[in-house]
Design a protein with these regions (language model features):
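A conserved acidic beta->alpha catalytic loop
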Residues: 38-48, 92
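A conserved hydrophobic helix/loop-capping motif in glycosyltransferases and polysaccharide synthases
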Residues: 5-17, 21, 28-29, 38, ...
């Protein structure tokens, strides 16, 4: 079997969404592709479901999540195809997404698809806002499929310069720059690697013929039936740790243009003189100053 792309999908207690995601890849791919799921500190039956459906997966059996960066890296290492695609468990792939990606992908390039999102977040020049449902149970599949079919002709040949999930790259190219920085856990790992792609001269392409419906992290960031974000203490610790590590590394905050193409400012260095400093004060000040 000559498989083209490995879809890498980290998932933590997202079985409800993951089922739809995997179904869409199987049904809507033009080519034979591979799927690898990284099951991260899971307790919702994902591993058992993957076993039953003969889906390749890797697993973190501990109670402590490793994070999306770690999950992506393990999937990339295990991929048996020359091309890997970073995919989210709450994405539903439109028809022939894979073929549209392959049409533009070449060595030393990164190709992103185009997200269609419900009106949960503001509009952006890099995405399409259309409401095809907020949850897997109310997903309007027939309407979405029709929309994708029509938009493939409307956007035929259209590309812009932006980068975000889902994105694809040659396995050799992402391996050569060290893959994702695992110190960034589950947050800002994408901005970090996008910056490194640009600094290494990779061509950044967004194709508007490769469409996905994105439930905007409903599975990971929202409890079922509750509209407000709910996070535990561990989440906030990981997020704050990742953000500080990003600033330590880049000396700046994350910046993108209107199409979500990263702009990399000059690294700043702020010196702060504190009298009678102690570890508690230093922990608050660092990494904002040195």
């Amino acid at each position: 079997m000559n498989r083209k792309i490995t879809f890498c999908i980290p998932s933590k207690n997202n079985l409800r969404y993951l089922k739809n995601s995997i179904q869409s890849i199987k049904e809507n791919s033009l080519h034979q592709n591979e799927i690898i799921v990284y099951v991260d500190a899971d307790n919702d039956g994902t591993k058992e479901w993957l076993d039953q459906n003969n889906i390749k997966y890797l697993v973190n059996d501990t109670d402590i999540p490793k994070g999306i960066a770690y999950g992506y890296n393990r999937c990339i290492e295990a991929a048996e195809t020359p091309i890997v695609c970073m995919f989210h468990a709450d994405m539903y792939m439109g028809q022939w997404f894979d073929d549209a990606i392959l049409k533009h992908l070449k060595p030393l390039s990164v190709v992103s698809g185009t997200r269609i999102e419900p009106p949960l977040h503001p509009k952006g020049l890099e995405k399409i806002v259309e409401d095809f449902g907020m949850y897997p149970e109310d997903f309007k599949k027939a309407e979405f499929d029709k929309f994708v079919y029509e938009m493939r002709y409307v956007y035929q040949g259209k590309t812009t310069k932006g980068i975000f999930a889902p994105w694809a790259i040659y396995k050799e190219d992402i391996t050569s720059i060290g893959m994702h920085d695992e110190k960034l856990h589950s947050y800002h790992e994408d901005s970090d690697i996008f910056n490194r792609f640009i600094l290494n001269g990779y061509d950044i392409i967004q194709t508007w013929e490769a469409l996905v419906y994105h439930l905007t992290c409903r599975g990971g960031q929202f409890q079922d039936g509750i509209e407000q974000v709910t996070k535990d203490e561990f989440f906030h610790l990981m997020k704050n740790s990742s953000f500080k590590n990003y600033v330590r590394k880049w000396g700046t905050f994350i910046k993108n243009d209107e199409y979500q193409y990263p702009t990399i400012p000059h690294k700043y260095n702020v010196g702060i003189h504190i009298k009678n400093c102690n570890k508690q004060i230093l922990n608050i000040i660092e990494p904002w100053g040195t």
